[in-house]
Swiss-Prot record:
Pfam families xrefs: Cys_knot (PF00007), IGFBP (PF00219), TSP1_CCN (PF19035), VWC (PF00093)
Entry's Gene Ontology BP terms: angiogenesis; cartilage condensation; cell adhesion; cell migration; cell-matrix adhesion; chondrocyte differentiation; chondrocyte proliferation; DNA biosynthetic process
Ranges where the IGFBP N-terminal domain occurs: 27-98
Major localization class: secreted
Protein's recorded name: CCN family member 2
Localization: Secreted, Extracellular space, Extracellular matrix; Secreted
Lineage of the organism: Eukaryota, Metazoa, Chordata, Craniata, Vertebrata
PANTHER family: CCN FAMILY MEMBER 2, CONNECTIVE TISSUE GROWTH FACTOR-RELATED
Organism of this sequence: Homo sapiens (Human)
Location of region: Heparin-binding: 247-349
Amino acid sequence: MTAASMGPVRVAFVVLLALCSRPAVGQNCSGPCRCPDEPAPRCPAGVSLVLDGCGCCRVCAKQLGELCTERDPCDPHKGLFCHFGSPANRKIGVCTAKDGAPCIFGGTVYRSGESFQSSCKYQCTCLDGAVGCMPLCSMDVRLPSPDCPFPRRVKLPGKCCEEWVCDEPKDQTVVGPALAAYRLEDTFGPDPTMIRANCLVQTTEWSACSKTCGMGISTRVTNDNASCRLEKQSRLCMVRPCEADLEENIKKGKKCIRTPKISKPIKFELSGCTSMKTYRAKFCGVCTDGRCCTPHRTTTLPVEFKCPDGEVMKKNMMFIKTCACHYNCPGDNDIFESLYYRKMYGDMA
């Protein structure tokens, strides 16, 4: 091949090299483009396949409430953007919907602020691209008692909401103090100073952590603010570490470890940043008999993270006080149960 004929090839190669090695915009895009050799990832249904924030590789877009960075963008087809908070915090954000973004639910488009009943069990509202639902059925709790040692909810013919029934014990040797029903997390009601004649203060329960192990996100919606405007709030959460083998800590003869003891204080990690303080945190354990262990009482505290470049960011985080192990586990086929939606404060029971 002659030098003249190689001219276009050489130019194309130089252009391609420049595109692949260009520094991308943002803190996490300073290196050259390096994409995995395997084919583009297969995204779950409803999740867009987009170029990362550096314009290099195809990735599954982050969804509402998930953590995002320059390289991990939010789903643009759902009107989401990465909200980084203050200008100084430009590393990690949370995917947030633009004001007034509509919702797509069950193949139907709902306007922001529009309410609808998804089923006989749930009343839902679209808010800036997110659907929040309140249960229409009673969420009361019945714990084991001498006259009803094995309570459980059952679906009765002709009725929408499940009702409590008492089963006779199948095996008398299995009776123990374990809780048989999921109990609502303790939450704080509206600030008395925010109750005004022209504002009905409403706050949803914190949703369950988005991950069963490792760092996740928990969200809620409230209008408990000076402008009485609905806003989404988020906090970090960790139900249990992923690397811990908690089943090894279950005592002989037992089937659960409700709140395993942590041998030493730990530091939390978030996208390469480490908490500035150590924490003797509590985590929820596991069971070997099909029960779930979930947070029962929690509190929210600020945690400061320091990044390798010296930047410090502050994030609210859930801290567990107590856990409960129960059979009322969220169903994989029930989108609302899996998110632990609860009724809003101020609603009629």
